[in-house]
């Protein structure tokens, strides 16, 4: 992409001072390609997702899954909300892609027997959605926390553990969730951060629209081993490897701790690629 007069750059930095033009010599040009890393054309991946709970974000989630061209999703939604109400809301939302198979089950996932019947251990991902039909955010979070506790021990004893994602509505409840039990999203806190950023810099809305809208550009994690087998390996090496396949390297995540280092120094190096994921910006 050539930068034209009037274009504005999107920079990732610790603060505004670090966004000033550098006086250091310009690095050599990095070639940019388009081929996804280590993927065979036409290979379709089937992912099984169990969604526990229902709110107005579930239709958008199904639509987002449908934007991944080489992946097919079998999405099962379990909630106390009547299936007829869910289907009525789906008709007014984004049309799911044919690559997404959506099935509904009307159950109370806080009941141990009904949770076991859903077979969370057989899924690739388990997503707890904060219920919007309860009397309060606290009650919705209580259901999410109860459900996560019920599946925690069986999943730990299983041969493979699915990815667990929990949506909470009250930030005060975040301390009740151990990182080892899954990834955590606090929707109101996340939205407040976005609104604050947009209020300070209105032009950032176009960036967030691109990142969070269905399709387009997204941030994802991919194993470092897809980009390099070097020991040690530097972030500059990852930048070049990602650019060669049409991606933009943003940082590195340690799998063992879940910690993320964004925009590290180019010379920063790590020893073991098997314990690291690349945080990368990709186009779906």
Residue ranges of predicted features:
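Cytosolic regulatory regions of ion transport systems
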Residues: 1-284
């Amino acid at each position: 992409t050539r930068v034209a007069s009037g274009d504005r750059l999107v920079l990732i930095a610790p603060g505004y001072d670090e966004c000033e033009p550098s006086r250091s010599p310009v690095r050599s040009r990095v070639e940019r390609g388009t081929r996804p890393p280590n993927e065979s054309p036409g290979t379709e991946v089937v992912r099984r997702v169990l969604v526990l709970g229902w709110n107005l974000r579930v239709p958008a989630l199904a639509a987002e899954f449908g934007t991944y061209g080489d992946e097919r999703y079998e999405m099962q939604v379990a909630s106390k909300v009547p299936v007829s109400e869910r289907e009525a809301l789906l008709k007014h939302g984004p049309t799911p892609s044919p690559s997404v198979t959506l099935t509904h089950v009307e159950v109370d996932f806080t009941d141990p027997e009904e949770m076991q019947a859903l077979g969370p251990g057989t899924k690739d991902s388990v997503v707890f959605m904060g219920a919007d039909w309860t009397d309060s955010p606290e009650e919705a979070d209580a259901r999410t926390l109860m459900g996560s506790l019920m599946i925690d021990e069986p999943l730990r004893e299983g041969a493979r553990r699915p990815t667990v994602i929990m949506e909470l509505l009250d930030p005060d409840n975040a301390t009740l969730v151990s990182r080892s039990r899954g990834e955590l999203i606090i929707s109101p806190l996340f939205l407040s951060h976005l609104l604050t950023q947009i209020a300070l810099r209105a032009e950032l809305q176009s960036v967030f629209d691109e990142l969070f809208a269905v399709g387009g550009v997204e941030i994802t994690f991919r194993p470092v081993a897809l980009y390099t087998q070097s020991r040690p390996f530097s972030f500059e090496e990852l930048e070049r490897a990602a650019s060669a396949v049409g991606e933009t390297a943003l940082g590195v995540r340690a799998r063992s701790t879940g910690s993320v280092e964004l925009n590290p120094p180019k010379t920063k190096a790590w020893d073991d690629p098997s314990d690291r994921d690349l945080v990368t910006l990709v186009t779906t």
